[in-house]
Amino acid sequence: MPEATAGPLSAEQGASLYRLMTWLSPAFPVGAFSYSSGLEWAVEAGDVADAASLRDWLGAMLEHGAGFCDGVFLAQAYRAVEAGDDAALRDVAELAAAMVPSAERHLETTAQGKAFIEIVRHAWASDGLARAVGACNGALAYPVAVGLVSATHRVPLAATLHAFLHAVVSNWISAGARLVPLGQTDSQRLLAALEPAVIATGDRALRASLDDLGGATFRADLASLRHETQYTRLFRS
């Protein structure tokens, strides 16, 4: 998005901002509220017990785990669509669907990806969307779905990437607020505290290639596996 000015947005800038705010709003019905990315087990196990430990947990997931990897998948899917490279898009889609640590995390990303595409297909159709989805030839991970939709709508990549990561972190915080629990003010303090990490992770993902993918959030990955057999659960992951 352009630097701040006193003048109005252009029609294209206004449309891009409007669509990002809509697609990545908590009100957009992809079912994000029902997933915790393993956080529910982390609270059960005592790894996350208050605002400070939640901040550390989410910061690690963002910078060294699913947040960064999903950002790379989004950017690579966007660029493949922009270049008209169906083979590259298919490779990104397959890798994104495979590179998850548990069955529940696979459900989380592919169910949201499917819902996102279906809603956009009916309400925000664009030239090239059907071809891009068809090229993927299988389940679509959520970041890949967001990347290819934004590319077909010509929404700027950097803005899409930062908005996506903000939405992901916001959903994690929402889950944490219900589980720890946290109040509304603490939740907003946490979101504000993670702003630099969201920006830095978005910038890093924008410059990264698929060769840079990887993570070091083993406890978060194990939490997503342990959640599958957790006795009492609020969330699907």
Swiss-Prot record:
InterPro entries on file: UreF, UreF_sf
GO CC annotations, alphabetized: cytoplasm
Keyword annotations from UniProtKB, A to Z: Chaperone, Cytoplasm, Nickel insertion
Top-rank lineage group of the source organism: Bacteria
Pfam family, one: UreF
Primary location: cytoplasm
Any GO molecular function: nickel cation binding
Localization per record: Cytoplasm
Transmembrane regions listed in the UniProt entry: none
Family: Belongs to the UreF family.
Function: Required for maturation of urease via the functional incorporation of the urease nickel metallocenter.
Assembly, per entry: UreD, UreF and UreG form a complex that acts as a GTP-hydrolysis-dependent molecular chaperone, activating the urease apoprotein by helping to assemble the nickel containing metallocenter of UreC. The UreE protein probably delivers the nickel.
Protein name: Urease accessory protein UreF
Organism: Rhodopseudomonas palustris (strain HaA2)
Gene: ureF
